[in-house]
């Protein structure tokens, strides 16, 4: 069960299913408890007790390394990013808007998950779409004569000191402004911070991170409703008129309105890079 610092369950007041409510509902409940200063804890003492080490050895070891004994103590918890349901726009065969480039897995937005992924469906998506992409790539004509591109230097190395500090700032901004509970003012503030960080980025890693952050934040700002894992405190209701995927071209991200999804068929003109939410 989930409890606050006083040992009181808080999900029972938020949803009839309590801790078994949809993951977005539970996540908002946890975030609200933490923001209110009550704290949030996973209490497995009754459900597992002495069986915890055998049932969840990895979690148990991590708790013990942090000085927590889950057999006798509730475990402090907080929301964390787990899965991104948006991504690069693809059709049902993983084709992107760039000819010859396919995307599959969490990087792609196939629409298979809707607004709130069901448990384990990401694995099913990866298996199904990987097979479809492989078949489509194998059937595609091989084009010759293109000069081989110079590979970028992506060898692992610590980022420059200024980039390391910027990464910390970017992560804090995304958690605070583009996290579980969002609003227009916070998203606008996040975009401004992201632009500042991007302007000083030196490493490919930070440039990629700011690109992803910009796209996610702009898409969240454009969707003026709450749906699944996307919750806007200033637009808490679900808008039936927005029951479709939205496309955010890579470019002027601050003013991109959502529009109905299209399939990337033959001859469809599409922006060179886009993401969906």
Curated annotation (Swiss-Prot):
* GO biological process entries: 'de novo' NAD biosynthetic process from L-aspartate; NAD biosynthetic process
Q: Where does the record place the catalytic residues?
A: 23
The catalytic activity of this protein is classed by the Enzyme Commission as 1.4.3.16
Q: Which UniProt keywords apply?
A: Cytoplasm, FAD, Flavoprotein, Nucleotide-binding, Oxidoreductase, Pyridine nucleotide biosynthesis
Segments passing through the bilayer: none
Domain of life here?
Bacteria
Q: What is this protein called?
A: L-aspartate oxidase
Gene behind this chain? Answer: nadB
């Amino acid at each position: 069960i989930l409890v606050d610092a006083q040992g009181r369950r808080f999900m029972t007041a938020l949803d009839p299913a309590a801790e078994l409510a949809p993951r977005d509902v539970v996540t908002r409940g946890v975030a609200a408890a933490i923001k209110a200063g009550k704290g949030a804890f996973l209490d497995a003492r009754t459900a597992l007790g002495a069986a915890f080490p055998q049932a969840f050895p990895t979690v148990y070891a991590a708790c013990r390394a942090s000085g927590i004994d889950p057999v006798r103590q509730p475990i402090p918890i907080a929301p964390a990013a787990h899965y991104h349901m948006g991504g690069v726009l693809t059709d049902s065969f993983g084709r992107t808007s760039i000819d010859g480039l396919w995307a599959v897995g969490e990087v792609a937005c196939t629409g298979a998950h809707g607004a709130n992924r069901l448990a384990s469906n990401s694995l099913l998506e990866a298996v199904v779409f990987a097979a479809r992409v492989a078949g489509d790539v194998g059937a595609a004509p091989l084009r010759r004569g293109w000069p081989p591109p110079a590979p970028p230097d992506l060898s692992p190395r610590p980022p420059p000191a200024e980039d390391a500090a910027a990464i910390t700032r970017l992560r804090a901004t995304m958690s605070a402004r583009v996290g579980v509970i969002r609003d227009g003012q916070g998203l606008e503030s996040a975009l401004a911070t992201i632009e500042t960080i991007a302007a000083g980025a030196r490493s490919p890693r930070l440039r990629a991170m700011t690109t992803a952050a910009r796209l996610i934040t702009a898409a969240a700002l454009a969707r003026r409703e709450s749906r699944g894992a996307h919750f806007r405190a200033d637009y808490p209701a679900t808008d039936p008129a927005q029951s479709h995927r939205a496309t955010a071209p890579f470019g002027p991200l601050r003013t991109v309105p959502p529009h109905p999804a299209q399939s990337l068929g033959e001859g469809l003109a599409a922006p060179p890079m886009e993401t969906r939410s």
